[in-house]
């Protein structure tokens, strides 16, 4: 059933606008505000984060426990699908990067800086245009990872509760209304990112330049303190072996190549999940 959910999620992601209608974060942000408004919780931020995160996770686990024994688990299928779709990232990075691609292709550096800040949240004080391109490349890899790969990884490994936990922590780590809870959520999210980020780096090596990735990043693979975003940005750059960039078509081609690397990695992951489902 897990692989069926993964296939349905992929179809919804690619061919439906249902995800945007499902993803409503108001209830979670409101609950964070309620927990953060209690002085005892802000004085003990780890306790506050646990009080915020555990109730929705326990409720989901209870519902799954009730529904899975009924009708061979078919009643749990819609719930799992709903949870995984909600847990996917917000927005569409490929669409968001479109104006940057257009400006870069026109060799409009000033316009590229503007749309990168406006649409991608990238703020770079760069002396060279290639520095901006490298940051946008890293943003593309990170957004694709946190929006899709990490959620799918945790769902396949530990089920919908883990996928939901990842997105709850991600939203808590990115909100600015409860800074104390945000700091603790970011630390816990770093732990959640450690394993799937390394798995994606290994898949980059398998579908890209294996020798370059292993030579350049072997030491960082086991380093706990290396941020996932930085590791993935370096891995994507090395796996595609970008030797040329700069304004114009070559820079845009590097973004296209990076996206194709992500697509090949997704195909590899789905193939692994399919084999896993057959063997279990």
Residue locations for each model-derived region?
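Hydrophobic N-terminal alpha-helices or hydrophobic patches in metabolic proteins across all domains
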Residues: 1-280
């Amino acid at each position: 059933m897990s692989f069926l959910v993964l296939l349905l999620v992929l179809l919804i992601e690619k061919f439906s606008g249902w995800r945007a209608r499902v993803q409503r974060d108001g209830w979670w942000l409101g609950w964070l505000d309620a927990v953060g408004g209690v002085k005892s919780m802000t004085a003990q931020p780890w306790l506050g984060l646990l009080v915020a995160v555990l109730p929705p996770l326990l409720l989901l686990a209870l519902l799954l426990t009730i529904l899975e024994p009924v009708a061979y688990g078919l009643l749990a299928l819609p719930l799992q699908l709903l949870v995984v779709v909600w847990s996917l990232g917000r927005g569409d990075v490929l669409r968001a990067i479109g104006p940057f691609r257009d400006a870069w292709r026109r060799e409009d550096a000033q316009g590229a800086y503007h749309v990168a800040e406006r649409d991608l949240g990238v703020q770079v004080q760069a002396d060279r245009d290639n520095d901006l391109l490298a940051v946008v490349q890293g943003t593309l890899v990170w957004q694709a990872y946190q929006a899709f790969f990490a959620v799918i990884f945790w769902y396949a490994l530990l089920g919908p509760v883990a996928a939901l936990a990842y997105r709850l922590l991600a939203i808590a780590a990115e909100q600015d209304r409860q800074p104390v809870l945000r700091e603790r959520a970011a630390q816990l999210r770093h732990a959640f990112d450690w394993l799937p980020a390394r798995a994606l780096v290994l898949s980059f090596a398998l579908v890209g330049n294996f020798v370059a990735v292993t030579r350049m990043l072997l030491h960082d693979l086991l380093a706990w303190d290396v941020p996932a975003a930085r590791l993935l940005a370096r891995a994507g750059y090395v796996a595609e072996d970008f030797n040329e960039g700069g304004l114009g078509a070559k820079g845009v081609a590097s973004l296209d190549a990076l996206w194709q690397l992500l697509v090949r990695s997704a195909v590899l992951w789905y193939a692994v999940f399919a084999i896993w489902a057959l063997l279990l």
